[in-house]
């Protein structure tokens, strides 16, 4: 989960993307109601990619990982690449229908880039 704090605008990301978002404890940070009860491991991350998520995937004994989320062109691609770097033999899949990018074009570009890096992207 993208997790930022009140000092977000003072961070490198905040200086380059000066839009306060996902401030911990706010409605914009919480999962939608439909996902609140979903069981599974959640990772709070204050950067685009999560090394903790990559380590968990690499050490978890999984036969594949599926990613979904926002933004395809920032966080989803970053986490797909972290997992591929930390667990190169672990198949990673991104469901394009369960993601969205900043723009339709950047969404598509990110999906194409992930596909080039051997991430499964059904329908692309």
Q: Over which residues does each language-model region extend?
A:
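Von Willebrand factor
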Residues: 1-7
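Active-site-adjacent betaalpha module
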Residues: 7, 11-124
């Amino acid at each position: 989960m993208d997790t930022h704090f009140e000092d977000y605008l003072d961070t490198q990301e905040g200086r380059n993307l000066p839009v306060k978002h996902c401030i911990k404890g706010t409605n914009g940070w919480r999962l939608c109601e439909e996902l609140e009860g979903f069981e599974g491991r959640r990772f709070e991350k204050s950067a685009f990619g999560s090394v903790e998520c990559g380590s968990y995937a690499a050490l978890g004994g999984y036969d594949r990982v599926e990613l979904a989320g926002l933004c395809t062109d920032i966080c989803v691609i970053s986490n797909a690449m972290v997992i591929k770097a930390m667990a190169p033999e672990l198949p990673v899949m991104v469901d394009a229908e369960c993601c969205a990018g900043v723009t339709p074009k950047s969404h598509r570009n990110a999906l194409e880039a992930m596909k080039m890096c051997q991430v499964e992207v059904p329908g692309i």
